[in-house]
From Swiss-Prot:
Membership in a protein family: Belongs to the protein kinase superfamily. Ser/Thr protein kinase family. MAP kinase subfamily. HOG1 sub-subfamily.
Gene: HOG1
Catalyses which reaction(s): L-seryl-[protein] + ATP = O-phospho-L-seryl-[protein] + ADP + H(+); L-threonyl-[protein] + ATP = O-phospho-L-threonyl-[protein] + ADP + H(+)
PANTHER family: MITOGEN-ACTIVATED PROTEIN KINASE
Known cofactor(s): Mg(2+)
Function text: Proline-directed serine/threonine-protein kinase involved in a signal transduction pathway that is activated by changes in the osmolarity of the extracellular environment. Controls osmotic regulation of transcription of target genes.
Region of interest: Disordered: 394-414
Positions of ATP binding: 29-37, 52
PTM section of the record: Dually phosphorylated on Thr-174 and Tyr-176, which activates the enzyme.
Gene3D superfamilies: Phosphorylase Kinase, domain 1, Transferase(Phosphotransferase) domain 1
Protein name: Mitogen-activated protein kinase HOG1
Taxon lineage: Eukaryota, Fungi, Dikarya, Ascomycota, Saccharomycotina
Active site residues per record: 144 (proton acceptor)
Location(s) in or outside the cell: Cytoplasm; Nucleus
Sites of Phosphothreonine modification: 174
Length: 447
């Protein structure tokens, strides 16, 4: 079993970072979705990596599910223009760390330093759309595409990151998701019935920002955001208005004076015509009339880079069966640990479930594993209090506790009463042993 000596603790922005001794030279690089991100050196590969700490992933069932979703997505989505998961581990404090390649900068920082030359705008836009084609083919909507989620290295290789908000393609999706400047109008107008087209709108806003060096729709609030969109696109067409579900929103939109659109050729007079044409096809009020990522790649503007044989789609749709699940934290914990062990190609560990099984079967197995771990913890607590013979330990049904559990409990009670007493405080301490095993076996596997 892994021990704390395998981890190095340091304070980053007042937050404890606990990493295995495989990684060194930690430096903060920013905050990602729901976590702190640091750069580090991977001593096994001698390469620079980014380590994202997911803080308190098991604090609530909502946080556990969100972390599980991001882990599943990172395992499933493997593409040159998407951030790639290289390692994952759990710390003794039960925080989760995702390790990915380090890109150096992001598009937001790049745009703040200098205007982009035309060839870079073209190449970056191609890579964004190439990544989106793959993501959408997997049945996934990113939902939070913005310049700070577009990572770039010194070779101009671009990768989309932060899938913490990603969701299934679902015509009934609801919520308040992307950063305002890049938010599609259907989200503001309806708050539901949106799909992959929201990413195309966001990519169009990013495209315009790369061209002009400043945000296209810098709204101060929802009303102002909608107003400056209509300044360019004109009033939304009637078929879009008909999809508005909120009565208050409908009253607001229909109360506005009619606005005519400004031709994109006038708004972007100094921009090459092919770029203007593609931008106009991406920034359309009606999401169903917006160009797709696949069709955008074939647009004449991207002809210098377009290669239909090198713009792959996902081999399989992402499995979203867990999306509507309402499970307790301990069940999510077991499922998460099992996914981590599977990532490291480790099998046969106590408490591990089969991640290739159907979701319902995984839930059933994880529920049993969580219950067994709780029983183990209660047995430890019972012995620490009563110092009874481990051979006398009984399950609730009257059957003897298995020998290995009893023996481990006895050893724990006789050699370290304080450690055994900790099991009484929380059954999750025992479940955390699965995490330590995951780290231990992963380290052995990588050496």
């Amino acid at each position: 079993m892994a021990t704390n000596e395998e981890f190095i603790r340091t304070q980053i922005f007042g937050t404890v970072f606990e990493i295995t001794n495989r990684y060194s030279d930690l430096n903060p690089v920013g905050m990602g979705a729901f976590g702190l991100v640091c750069s580090a050196t991977d001593t096994l590969t001698n390469q620079q990596v980014a380590i994202k700490k997911i803080m308190k992933p098991f604090a609530t069932a909502v946080l556990a599910k969100r972390t599980y979703r991001e882990l599943k997505l990172l395992k499933h989505l493997r593409h040159e223009n998407l951030i790639c998961l290289q390692d994952i581990f759990l710390s003794p404090l039960e925080d989760i760390y995702f390790v990915t390649e380090l890109q150096g900068t992001d598009l937001h920082r790049l745009l703040q330093t200098r205007p982009l030359e035309k060839q870079f705008v073209q190449y970056f836009h191609y890579q964004i759309l190439r990544g989106l084609k793959y993501v959408h083919s997997a049945g996934v909507v990113h939902r939070d595409l913005k310049p700070s989620n577009i990572l770039i290295n010194e070779n101009c290789d671009l990768k989309i990151c932060d899938f913490g908000l990603a969701r299934i393609q679902d015509p009934q999706m609801t919520g308040y998701v992307s950063t305002r400047y890049y938010r599609a109008p259907e989200i503001m107008l309806t708050w539901q019935k949106y799909d992959v087209e929201v990413d195309i709108w966001s990519a169009g806003c990013i495209f315009a920002e790369m061209i002009e060096g400043k945000p296209l729709f810098p709204g101060k609030d929802h009303v102002h955001q909608f107003s400056i969109i209509t300044d360019l696109l004109g009033s939304p067409p009637s078929d879009v208005i008909d999809t508005i579900c909120s009565e208050n929103t409908l009253k607001f939109v229909t109360s506005l004076p009619h606005r005519d659109p400004i031709p994109f050729s006038e708004r972007f007079k100094t921009v090459e015509p092919d770029a203007v044409d593609l931008l106009e096809k991406m920034l359309v009020f009606d999401p169903k009339k917006r160009i797709t990522a696949a069709d955008a790649l074939a647009h004449p503007y991207l002809a210098p880079y377009h290669d239909p044989t090198d713009e792959p789609v996902a081999e399989a749709k992402f499995d979203w069966h867990f999306n509507d699940a309402d499970l307790p934290v301990d069940t999510w914990r077991v499922m998460m640990y099992s996914e981590i062990l599977d990532f490291h190609k480790i099998g046969g560990t106590d408490g591990q479930i089969d991640t290739s099984a159907t979701f319902d079967d995984q839930v059933a197995a994880a529920t049993v594993a969580a219950a067994q771990a709780q029983a183990h913890a209660l047995a430890q607590a019972q012995m620490s209090q009563n110092m009874i013979d481990p051979n006398q330990l009984l399950n609730e049904d009257g059957t003897p506790v298995s020998g290995s559990i009893a023996e481990n409990s006895s050893n724990s009670a006789t050699t370290n009463l304080n450690g055994a007493a900790a099991g009484m405080n929380s059954a999750s301490d025992t479940i955390n042993e699965y995490a330590n095993q995951a780290v231990h076996f992963a380290n052995e596997f990588q050496q």
